[in-house]
């Protein structure tokens, strides 16, 4: 039993360190889906992952003096329902920033 393209759902997962760049990418994807008459739901914000690194400030003995750095990974999900072939072509040709990681599932 095969499902036609009109009944499928495209799930797009986006990850980035910069929240503003991620939101701009989400807006571009939703705008592209709207221009090709596909319905888009999202962006749905997922929990932000924080990775904290502890580094000694001194190269020698002062272990009491430490510095903390963190990276935050912001994540979003966009679901596109009833995509057409035109929608998929437009999403493939979309120019997004290099700092945004994209995963697409059909």
Curated annotation (Swiss-Prot):
It comes from the Bacteria. One of its GO terms (molecular function) is structural constituent of ribosome. Keywords: Ribonucleoprotein, Ribosomal protein. Pfam families: Ribosomal_S10. Part of the 30S ribosomal subunit. Belongs to the universal ribosomal protein uS10 family. This is Small ribosomal subunit protein uS10. It comes from Prochlorococcus marinus (strain MIT 9515).
